[in-house]
């Protein structure tokens, strides 16, 4: 029997917090989902100029500092309010640009990022620890991801998926047979998934085991150009390929395929076990994970920005429409809650933390917006080594504990008083409690939040 400890917001936590947004699209599964709430209306807090265009995405580490790469081949570490610069790392010896790469943070605050030529590892204070390969021989555009085994994975135009140890040694390279122009993702089982582009049909979606062996391959009818996969709570893989959106089961079999009105050039956001959001062309789509498209909201532009979802289900996304580019907050029912004219293309995908929401623009600028829910304790819902999650989150009462098993759970009120207890069960019933944000601590994982509506 495993034990899950549920604490109400405001109760002191002794365990270290995890990174609120640890890598591209938040976590190694690319869920795009946060356990923090931003809400609407949005207020612009800061717009900070950098030394180059920001087409990659920011990440937020556990102390609130924001890291982002720019096309001037520098990695910036900014204060939580973007008003201070902790350090900047010059990566020009390792490439000539940072295209769409977001940093990836490990548990020690070390940083991995790809330039257009190499994978670079830096310490928490911006010192380069190593780079790979030793020469600028690769062509890389997208983000690395850290696996459950600590290895770092990235794909490139040279037709291979690479795995490196934390010490910078090549563990293996898997030949994909064609180019990869998107970021790999880590499945709940630890396998690595990567999509392909260029050439002619079919375009393989690969599932590679952590030791470099092929687990399965599923052929897609469209190419995944700028389209990275995301993994759902049940292990299903969601991937846009040209004008199709695919759901592929964790065993490699097709669950469904839906046709959209435009090419998908971003990563889906998995709001919960039944809902995901994806951008295709000028539209934001809400998709039922069983039955397909629920609604489409026009947001304008031809977009590369991957949407992000907060703990209340609000969706945040930017557009690339030149001087008409906007940043949107959209409710789960497709209602526009707020939008702000930014005036420059937003290719960067937003990152959510307790401080607010961050994104960059092609006008060399990083933005911080806050909403009514900003300022909460920094925390995110980690999958952990076993893929453990509380589902659905947000919830209206009953929360299922995944993966399936028998758990002992205790629930405390704001004063730390035990108000409920569950023994040897696979779910928690919070329906007798008032609405609010609860802190969840799982032995062996970081504390996280569950929102009771």
Which residues does each PLM region occupy?
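Positively charged n-region of N-terminal signal peptides that target proteins for export
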Residues: 1-4, 452-453
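Extracellular low-complexity Ser/Thr/Asn/Gly-rich intrinsically disordered segments
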Residues: 374-380
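Positively charged, low-complexity intrinsically disordered regions
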Residues: 3, 63, 149, 219, ...
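C-terminal outer-membrane/trafficking sorting elements
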Residues: 380-453
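Secretory-pathway ectodomains
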Residues: 17-374
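Bacterial N-terminal signal peptides
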Residues: 6-14
């Amino acid at each position: 029997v495993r034990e899950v400890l549920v604490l109400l917001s405001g109760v002191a936590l002794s365990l270290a917090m995890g990174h609120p947004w640890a890598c591209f699209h938040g976590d190694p599964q690319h869920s795009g989902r946060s356990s923090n709430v931003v809400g609407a209306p949005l207020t612009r807090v800061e717009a900070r100029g950098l030394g180059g265009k920001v087409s990659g995405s920011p990440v937020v580490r556990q102390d609130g500092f924001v890291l982002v790469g720019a096309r001037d081949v520098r990695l910036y570490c900014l204060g939580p309010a973007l008003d201070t610069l902790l350090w900047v790392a010059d990566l020009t010896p390792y490439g000539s640009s940072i295209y769409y790469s977001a940093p990836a943070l490990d548990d020690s605050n070390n940083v991995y990022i790809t330039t257009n030529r190499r994978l670079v590892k830096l310490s928490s204070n911006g010192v380069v620890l190593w780079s790979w390969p030793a020469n600028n021989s690769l062509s890389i555009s997208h983000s690395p991801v850290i696996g459950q085994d600590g290895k770092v994975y990235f794909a490139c135009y040279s037709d291979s998926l690479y795995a490196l140890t934390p010490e910078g040694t090549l563990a293996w390279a898997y030949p994909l047979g064609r180019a990869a122009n998107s970021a790999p993702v880590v499945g709940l089982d630890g396998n690595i998934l990567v999509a392909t582009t260029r050439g002619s049909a079919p375009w393989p979606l690969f599932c590679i085991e952590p030791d470099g062996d092929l687990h399965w391959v599923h052929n897609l009818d469209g190419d995944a150009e700028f389209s990275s996969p995301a993994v759902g709570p049940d292990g299903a893989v969601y991937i846009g390929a040209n004008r199709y959106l695919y759901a592929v089961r964790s065993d490699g079999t097709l669950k469904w395929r839906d046709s959209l009105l435009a090419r998908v050039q971003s990563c889906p956001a998995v709001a919960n076990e039944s809902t995901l959001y994806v951008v295709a062309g000028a539209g934001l789509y809400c998709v039922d994970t069983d039955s397909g498209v629920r609604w489409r909201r026009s947001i304008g532009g031809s977009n590369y920005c991957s949407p992000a979802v907060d703990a209340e289900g609000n969706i945040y996304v930017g557009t690339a429409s030149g001087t008409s580019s906007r940043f949107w907050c959209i409710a789960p029912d497709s209602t526009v809650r707020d939008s702000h004219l930014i005036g420059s293309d937003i290719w960067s995908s937003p990152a959510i933390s307790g401080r607010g929401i961050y994104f960059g623009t092609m006008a060399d600028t990083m933005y911080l917006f806050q909403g009514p829910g900003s300022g909460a304790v920094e925390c995110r819902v980690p999958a952990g080594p076993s893929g453990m999650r509380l589902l659905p989150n947000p919830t209206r009462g009953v929360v299922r504990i995944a993966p399936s098993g028998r758990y002992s759970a205790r629930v405390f009120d704001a004063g730390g008083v035990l108000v409920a207890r569950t023994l040897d069960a696979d779910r928690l019933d919070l329906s007798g409690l008032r609405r609010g944000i609860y802190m969840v601590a799982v032995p062996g994982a970081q504390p996280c939040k569950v929102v009771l509506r």
